[in-house]
Regions:
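Glycine-aromatic micro-motifs
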Residues: 1-201
Length: 201
């Protein structure tokens, strides 16, 4: 069935699970909190701050062949938040980026990618000029399952952050504690941009 482009644009970042999971060629299997993850030594931990947390988006990126399983681990990252980037994605959504914000504890996921999976993710993230690939270190991050993490790779916006009068705008769909700024849904942020660019429309 062909995907409705308007629905895709308006529903970013798409449904995000509440627990860690294995993504395997479009199928997801929950990882129990007491389950031990193995085989991560040769994988790269990449923090997902927007739609890469959602199996729906992972299914769009990893299709057409057998990509193998991807462990996707729920975390709580301290002193950062998921906020909007000031650009429009090719599919019409206002996407996310990571911003340092003291006192915020944001629920995000880490994708553990093997070499082939990482190459594919690069193709979907850094083929344009909107995101760069980097490393965050010295983090305070709690993991639901798997080994402790002190550093993680990330695709972060090269455009900065989308701000209103109070600062960067958090994603309402991404759970967080300690926010002092009003978060907006995808529809709300699109309306905000419309009103800024074309008041009274």
């Amino acid at each position: 069935m062909q995907e409705d482009p308007l629905t895709r644009a308006k529903t970013y970042p798409y449904p995000i699970p509440s627990t860690s999971f294995i993504f395997d060629n479009g199928e997801t299997t929950a990882i129990e909190a007491d389950e031990r993850l193995t085989g991560l030594a040769d994988r790269t931990p990449v923090l997902a701050v927007g739609s890469n947390q959602s199996p729906i988006q992972l299914s769009r990126k990893f299709n057409g062949r057998d990509w193998g399983p991807i462990p996707v681990v729920r975390t709580v990252l301290h002193n950062y938040d998921s906020v909007y980037s000031p650009h429009v994605a090719s599919y019409g959504s206002i996407p996310a980026t990571l911003q340092e914000v003291a006192g915020v504890r944001v629920s995000l996921f880490v994708t553990w990618l093997d070499e082939v999976q990482l190459t594919r993710m690069h193709e979907t993230e850094v083929s344009g000029a909107n995101y760069s690939f980097g490393l965050l270190s010295d983090l305070q991050i709690e993991v639901e399952v798997g080994p402790p993490i002190e550093a993680v790779h990330i695709y972060n916006s090269t455009r900065g952050t989308l701000c209103d009068d109070h600062g960067p705008i958090p994603l309402l769909e991404v759970r967080a504690e300690g926010r002092s700024r009003r978060a907006m849904s995808q529809l709300e942020v699109q309306e905000h941009i419309r009103d800024v660019l074309n008041p009274g429309m």
